[in-house]
Curated annotation (Swiss-Prot):
GO biological process terms on file: gluconeogenesis; glycolytic process
Name recorded for this polypeptide: Phosphoglycerate kinase
A Pfam entry, by short name: PGK
Record's catalysed reaction(s): (2R)-3-phosphoglycerate + ATP = (2R)-3-phospho-glyceroyl phosphate + ADP
Keywords for the protein's UniProt record, in alphabetical order: ATP-binding, Cytoplasm, Glycolysis, Kinase, Nucleotide-binding, Transferase
Coiled coil ranges: none
InterPro entries named among the record's database cross-references: Phosphoglycerate_kinase, Phosphoglycerate_kinase_CS, Phosphoglycerate_kinase_N, Phosphoglycerate_kinase_sf
Binding site for substrate: D19, Y20, N21, R34, H57, L58, G59, R60, R117, R150
Originating organism: Deinococcus geothermalis (strain DSM 11300 / CIP 105573 / AG-3a)
Enzyme class at the top of the EC tree: transferase
Binding site for ATP: K200, G288, E319, G347, G348, D349, S350
Length: 389
């Protein structure tokens, strides 16, 4: 990939595609992680004499501009984080008004444009929109790893029209995740959780031949347990994936580790009645909503001595405190490896768990890209990453 050092930015207007797709409630940004993650690239470019024009999407607006999807609240957060004024340009990124506002920027100045998904051509990678966006800068930097798997106008489209490079965040993400695919230090342990096998099939398929152990948790565990003939009560199961899970167990049974116990509930609610039962004997009318304490201990033990670890997806219904113990135990076990192992955590709930455990600093890499991380680990080429080559 082309790196920032290879790009001439002094006195230039640099269009930077960032990922500010952040949760906003009542006009207030709830989580600033993605804004903070973009700072090293922005500071690097400013220090080298660039003026910055920032592009991002927010949410999935369906009918053009909508107030709740405006990036205006993000401008205030960015201004505070950068320690310099950020000019918010409320007109559509493709408009003449925006072009005029951007042309007046001086080196060291920063402008944040309105949500690029307000443009109907963004997700279609419309050539006309690509041209209009390319006019806003002399060079282009892609730093939105979370959007790198999208062939959109502001991601891969503009890259074809301007001198370009990968930002520091994008570069670090690709390097960090590639280490999980190419010559990882062993033992290599992967923890996969979440509700559905179908969401993670390709990652499981691509990683299983490479790992020493794969620990399964979350709702998807019951599809595997059903494949082994277990009783799962009312637990979540994907019937159309049972045969596939059975095939994986036959082929990789020595590497796949399944829960031996589960926290079962009489209904899906935070205040449900609970009991710990064998994972393959969930009583009728009950549902498994977390891995049990015996499994949590076994998984922590399986992680001891690992040299490479990747964790994606919660072990249970992490939003309900009664079913968060499994996820928290895994967060603790991953963090305790410290610098004895190369550890990567990706996926919203796993990242939340590691942050809440107060142990995030002990993890080698926390990935900001949900779908993009998974697609890279599936062995797919990401349009944004390919465009930076």
């Amino acid at each position: 990939m082309q790196t920032l050092d290879q790009l001439d930015v002094n006195g230039k207007r640099v269009l930077v595609r960032v990922d500010y797709n952040v949760p906003i409630k009542d006009g207030v940004v709830q989580d600033e992680t993605r804004v903070t993650a973009s700072l090293p690239t922005l500071q690097h470019l400013l220090a080298r004499g660039a003026a910055l024009v920032l592009l991002s999407h927010l949410g999935r607006p369906k009918n053009g501009p909508e107030e709740k999807y405006s990036l205006r609240p993000v401008a205030a957060v960015l201004e505070r984080a950068l320690g310099r004024p950020v000019k918010f340009i409320a007109s559509l990124p493709s408009s003449e008004e925006t072009r005029r506002a951007v042309e007046s920027l001086q080196p060291g100045e920063v402008a944040l444009l309105e949500n690029v998904r307000f443009e109907p051509g963004e997700e279609k990678n419309d050539p006309e929109l690509v041209e209009q966006l390319a006019r806003l800068g002399d060079a282009f930097v892609l730093d939105a790893f979370g959007s790198a798997h999208r062939a959109h106008a502001s991601v891969s489209g503009v890259a074809g029209r301007l001198p370009h490079a990968a930002g520091l965040l994008l570069h670090n993400e690709v390097e960090a995740l590639s280490r999980l695919l190419h010559d990882p230090a062993r033992p290599y342990v992967v923890i996969i959780g979440g509700a559905k096998v179908s969401d993670k099939i390709k990652v499981i398929e691509n990683l299983l031949p490479r790992v020493d152990r794969m620990l399964i948790g979350g709702g998807m565990m019951f599809t595997f347990i059903r494949a082994r003939g277990g009783q799962i009560g009312n637990s979540l199961v994907e019937e159309d994936q049972v045969a596939y899970a059975r095939q994986l167990l036959e082929q990789y049974g020595d590497r796949l580790m399944l829960p031996t116990d589960a926290v079962a509930a009489d209904r899906f609610a935070p205040d449900a009645q609970t009991r710990v039962v064998p994972a393959d004997r969930i009583p009728d009318g009950w549902m498994g909503l977390d891995i049990g304490p015996e499994t949590a201990r076994a998984y922590a033990e399986a992680l001891q001595g690992a040299k490479t670890v990747f964790w994606n997806g919660p072990m249970g219904v992490f939003e309900f405190p009664a079913f968060a113990a499994g996820t928290n135990a895994v967060a603790q076990a991953v963090a305790e490896l410290g610098n004895q192992a190369y550890t990567v955590v990706g996926g919203g709930d796993s990242v939340s768990a590691i942050n809440q455990s107060g142990q995030a600093s002990k993890v080698s890499h926390i990935s900001t890209g949900g779908g993009a991380s998974l697609e890279l680990l599936e062995g797919q080429l990401l349009p944004g990453v390919e465009a930076m080559k």
